[in-house]
Amino acid sequence: MFKKLKNKNKTETNHNNDLDIHNIPEHVAIIMDGNGRWAKKRKMPRIKGHYEGMQTIKKITREASDIGIKYLTLYAFSTENWSRPESEVNYIMNLPVNFLKTFLPELIEKNVKIETIGFYEGLPQSTIDAIDFAKAKTQHNTGLTLVFAINYGGRAEIIQSMKAIYNELQLNGQGSEVIDEALIKRHLMTHSYPDPDLLIRTSGEQRISNFLIWQASYSEFIFNEKLWPDFDEKELRECLKIYQSRQRRFGGLSEE
């Protein structure tokens, strides 16, 4: 549990924005919501909102890296998003190709590591190839780990992990008594990352939409009113300040 600093005058700051460097969340997850509404408000096609949302990803990735966040997980496309119009889905599927083509050199320079969670089944081969290329090029980087949740759903992830655990127990002749949280975590797509300390959702909606439903059990939640294309570095820092003003209890009692 993070402790509040008793002497604010001695609090060290980060990035010249009054952030306590001893209380930077290790893992920030973001539900990037509001691209369509952003475009609609401007009487533009929805794909324009997705394009501008991609530009926001670049800004937030740079800022997260500069601040010292270790893991940034972005909800890019859910298992439920396939129900959207085909033209919109096709455009979204091509975004990783364009994003990585233009941004990968900078990510490499900033020592950012690219990873993904989700299911490859159903993704276009061009999308898979772009993702795999970026992963290979950044696999040894040691700075920010940028995780894209693509064709991801929390329930589907848990179902997959349960099947894998069942098969493992069958193979080893073990019973259900060996199942614990650690075993489940080892079979989740996020097994190599810490659970998110902070989960942000933009657009003002207050739900998690099947995102990291196991991992976010003790996350701090912030629901930001900005639509994703309007979410910027200042908004991210404000969210971090709110996070730092809270005391995480993990089911325990406040120290006050």
Curated annotation (Swiss-Prot):
PROSITE patterns: UPP_SYNTHASE (PS01066). The keyword Iron does not apply. GO terms for molecular function: ditrans,polycis-undecaprenyl-diphosphate synthase [(2E,6E)-farnesyl-diphosphate specific] activity; magnesium ion binding; manganese ion binding. SUPFAM superfamilies: Undecaprenyl diphosphate synthase (SSF64005). Pfam families: Prenyltransf. Its EC number is 2.5.1.-. The active site is at D33, N81. GO terms for biological process: polyprenol biosynthetic process. Mg(2+) binds at D33, E220. Homodimer. HAMAP family: ISPT (MF_01139). Belongs to the UPP synthase family. Catalyzes the condensation of isopentenyl diphosphate (IPP) with allylic pyrophosphates generating different type of terpenoids. NCBIfam families: PRK14830.1, uppS. This is Isoprenyl transferase. It comes from Staphylococcus epidermidis (strain ATCC 35984 / DSM 28319 / BCRC 17069 / CCUG 31568 / BM 3577 / RP62A). The gene is uppS.
